[in-house]
């Protein structure tokens, strides 16, 4: 399994074996857009999760600034999804938000759309983590 920056955005991890070049490019854009939306680093891992969540947690630890990062790990052969948040990211991405993202991903995966499912999940997480705009009464 690859670890560290695999060239798919600032923090992404991707096991590229099941993915085409176009899909890898799409994942790079997805990760970059998510970072611009909420400021957290996002990583995507596609590949075997031999030890389930433990594998995902180990991959998350290799990200740049894991405390402020989110890893979406998908094992297509086992139909498994693991979402790991760092301690800072968890302040805005609780278990409920991660469950919602996982459900959206499963829906797309059921239609045989791996990259679309990852896109939906990462976008939901990024939008949920976005800081709300604060308006004050004295602002125009």
Question: Where is each model-derived feature located?
Answer:
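A structural boundary signal for the start of the first folded domain, especially the loop/turn
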Residues: 1-69, 77-140
């Amino acid at each position: 399994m690859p670890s560290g920056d695999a060239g798919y955005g600032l923090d992404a991890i991707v096991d590229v074996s099941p993915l085409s070049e176009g899909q890898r490019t799409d994942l790079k854009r997805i990760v970059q857009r998510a970072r611009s939306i909420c400021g957290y680093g996002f990583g995507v891992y596609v590949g075997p999760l031999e030890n389930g969540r433990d594998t995902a947690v180990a991959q998350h630890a290799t990200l740049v600034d894991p405390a402020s990062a989110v890893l979406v790990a998908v094992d297509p052969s086992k139909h498994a999804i693991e979402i790991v948040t760092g301690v800072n990211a968890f302040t805005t991405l609780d278990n409920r938000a991660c469950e919602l993202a996982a459900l959206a991903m499963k829906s797309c995966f059921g239609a045989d759309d791996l990259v679309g499912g990852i896109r939906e999940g990462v976008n939901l997480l990024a939008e949920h983590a976005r800081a709300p705009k604060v308006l004050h009464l004295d602002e125009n």
